[in-house]
Amino acid sequence: MAQIFNPNPGNTLDTVANALKEQANAANKDVNDAIKALQGTDNADNPALLAELQHKINKWSVIYNINSTVTRALRDLMQGILQKI
């Protein structure tokens, strides 16, 4: 007989959440490091450091939006399943 439920599938909600959390934490650290690099008196108007900060903030924003979208999609999925029960 075919196995209906496999308790150890490749992707679970926990693995997705952990992967997103790791990426968000790394992006947050990158933004904080870029801000610290700008805090010197000579670095405040350095175009290269400002561009790097902007890039890090954009990357953080994209990861945050992906995290929000995935979380919302999973919530909607669970609501749909529960409504049909």
From Swiss-Prot:
Q: Does the keyword Secreted apply?
A: yes
- Record-linked Pfam families: T3SS_needle_F
Which example biological process does GO assign this protein?
protein secretion by the type III secretion system
Record note on domains: The N-terminal part (1-11) is species-specific and essential for export/assembly and the function of needle.
In the record, the note on similarity to other proteins reads: Belongs to the SctF family.
Q: What is the effect of changing D14V?
A: Shows a constitutive secretion phenotype
Record keywords, A-Z: Coiled coil, Protein transport, Secreted, Transport, Virulence
Q: What is its main location?
A: secreted
Which proteins does it associate with, and in what oligomeric form? The core secretion machinery of the T3SS is composed of approximately 20 different proteins, including cytoplasmic components, a base, an export apparatus and a needle. This subunit polymerizes and forms the helical needle filament. Forms a stable heterotrimeric complex with PscE and PscG in the cytoplasm, blocking it in a monomeric state and preventing its polymerization.
| CC per GO annotation | cell surface; extracellular region; type III protein secretion system complex
Q: What is this protein called?
A: Type 3 secretion system needle filament protein
